[in-house]
């Protein structure tokens, strides 16, 4: 019996929606990465983008476990001498509340061309409003 690999043109994509309100960032990101990658499907192939679109709402209300809210640091480097900056989650939430979820998910998907393509199917919104109601997203609960 031969192993079946799904072809890119055969993939049927669905839309899922996850509410991140009062949910732990890592657990939300893990579920989102699984859905984006397509690992929940029986036809998963590691070299084919078999994943679905994922909408994350209330991203600004996601929480960290433990003391990460005060101790975790995000860093950015401009490329110049002395150009490294560090930001706490509190500072990030004020400027870009979606970044925390996006950064966590980006770290959980492959770091190659396929991963960049997978990442385009992630839609993160600060509040509960989103423009994807026409796609009839399926609500996902975190277990």
Swiss-Prot record:
Signal peptide: none annotated. One of its GO terms (biological process) is negative regulation of translation. GO terms for molecular function: mRNA binding; structural constituent of ribosome. It holds the Pfam family Ribosomal_L13. Disulfide bonds: none annotated. Keywords: Ribonucleoprotein, Ribosomal protein. GO terms for cellular component: cytosolic large ribosomal subunit. Transmembrane segments: none annotated. InterPro entries: Ribosomal_uL13, Ribosomal_uL13_bac-type, Ribosomal_uL13_CS, Ribosomal_uL13_sf. Belongs to the universal ribosomal protein uL13 family. Part of the 50S ribosomal subunit. This protein is one of the early assembly proteins of the 50S ribosomal subunit, although it is not seen to bind rRNA by itself. It is important during the early stages of 50S assembly. This is Large ribosomal subunit protein uL13. It comes from Methylacidiphilum infernorum (isolate V4).
């Amino acid at each position: 019996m031969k192993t079946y690999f799904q072809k890119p043109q055969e993939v049927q994509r669905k839309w899922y929606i996850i509410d991140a309100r009062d949910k732990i960032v890592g657990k939300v990101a893990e579920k989102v990465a699984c859905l984006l990658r397509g690992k929940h499907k029986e036809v998963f192939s590691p070299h084919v983008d078999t994943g679905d679109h994922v909408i994350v709402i209330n991203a600004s209300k996601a929480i960290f476990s433990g003391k990460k809210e005060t101790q975790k640091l995000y860093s950015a480097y401009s490329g110049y001498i002395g150009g490294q900056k560090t930001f706490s989650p509190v500072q990030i939430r004020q400027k870009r509340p979606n970044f925390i979820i996006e950064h966590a998910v980006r770290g959980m998907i492959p770091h190659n061309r396929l991963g960049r393509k997978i990442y385009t199917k992630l839609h993160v919104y600060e509040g509960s409003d989103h423009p994807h109601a026409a796609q009839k997203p399926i609500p996902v609960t975190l277990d």
